Amino acid sequence: MSNTETDRLLDFPDTAAQPLLGNVRAAAELLECLTVDRALLEQLPADHRERLHRAVAKFYHPDKIARRQRLKAAEREVTAAQTERADAALNGTGIRTLRRKPVFTTPNVFPPPDFDSRAAEPQDAASAELLHCYVCKQKFQIIHHFYDQMCPECATFNFSKRTELADLTGRVALLTGGRVKIGYQAGLKLLRTGARLIVTTRFPRDSAQRYAAEADFSEWGHRLEIFGLDMRHTPSVEAFCRQLVSTLPRLDFIINNACQTVRRPPDFYTHMMEGERAALEHMPAEIRKLLCAYEEPRGEVLQRTGLQARPQTRAAELSQVPLIAEDLLGGNHLFPEGRLDQDLQQVDLRGRNSWRLLMDEVSSVELLEVQLINAVAPFIINARLKPLMMRTPERDKHIVNVSAVEGQFYRNCKTTRHPHTNMAKAALNMMTRTAATDYQGDGIHMNSVDTGWVTDEDPVEIAARKTAEQRFHPPLDIVDGAARILDPIISGINTGEHVWGQFLKDYRPTDW
């Protein structure tokens, strides 16, 4: 190697490294001279000569342990660089951008009049590593502009489903659990299709405020009614069904979305209670209108019985009743005041929750609650409201029982955790499997639908560690979950093909 080449290779701009570079240049020049004339070594004292030989030998051919350590360090550097580049591409996708926002922003389905779709056309990216598609399970390298875990074909299809609508003008839909997350997004989608919507939730006033805050609320707010209902109280569910049968002219769609996966103690809900207990007349007029059908009978009961209102008129209050010992162990250290998550729900800092429980750790109370909410209440609603659904002659009605793959029997990877929620979803699936044929004969198409992997249900600390150490991110968001549970209705109306008696995952039938 010539001095010119050496200078070029050692020409680094870092001035702090200049002394080291000078030593390296001198060492390189010495070795080059000795290579030309080895007799020069004989001029050195023997101990210096041996020292030089040992240093050159160790540098050129280190021992096995040092060599292995150097190779592993180099591999780690290469892997870290590749991971950094891959994460940069994945972090640029739309789904991760939405997830980083302090508050989840509902996508604007209807673009403004001056919107230029060509100018805003997002670009796909390429990954240096092979990725695994969440839907079709195939390997891919082209990263969709929105999804970080789908191949281009699956991503394009799923992205189109997020904003797909149908004309449901004049139709009436019942949606349980429509206050937050998937239920809330499903509610917005139904309202934007033109349907009249009845929403149930334990916290009707909080729910009303959320819907009223939407930019296009004035376009559909008059078609929305919100009822307070705690699905754990079966007489309340029965009373609610009787009220709908006696007051509604028709019912076209039922979406049984309300469920309990992770049980929360009373302190989780405390921050909403002031609003739920406040006098209705102090609330804005647009919110009062959403609650009239619920608040008027509630007011009559309160007036007749004083403070001892029936459970069906005090859904929010039931959330504050401690039922197990853990319900008394809350506090600001577990549920810090004022700290809300991306869905504007209370942050839960417990180190362990229902998602981590083994069978012998599940309380009888939680076991019964999960069955009542996830299986018994949908059974009652579907049964008691069938006459109302048959009141009009159309044969394109739908019942969606929102389920999960945890309720599948034909699933290879079944964990030992949360057996009680698995049982409830399996029971819900069996109801669909059994009753769908009967209901289809009356023009009512019943299906179970998996929402997809939208949320990491683990405690906050464990979920954060999985993201940092395993690079884990849920492959879908709540808009995807809503699109999935409403697809039997929207796709059926748009195509005229109404599926029934199926367990649907990723918009297609799957094993029970």
Q: Which residues fall in each region the model found?
A:
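Conserved Rossmann-fold SDR core element
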Residues: R223, R250, A436-T451, G496-F503
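Catalytic Tyr-X3-Lys loop
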Residues: T270-F379
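Amphipathic alpha-helical dimer-interface segment in Rossmann-like NAD(P)H-dependent oxidoreductases
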Residues: K64, A74-E75, A81-P111, K137-Q141, ...
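A glycine-rich helix->loop->beta "capping" turn
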Residues: D124, G221-E225, Q243-N256, F268
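Canonical Rossmann dinucleotide-binding motif of NAD(H)/NADP(H)-dependent dehydrogenases/reductases
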Residues: F159-P204
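C-terminal helical subdomain
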Residues: G299-E337, R465-W512
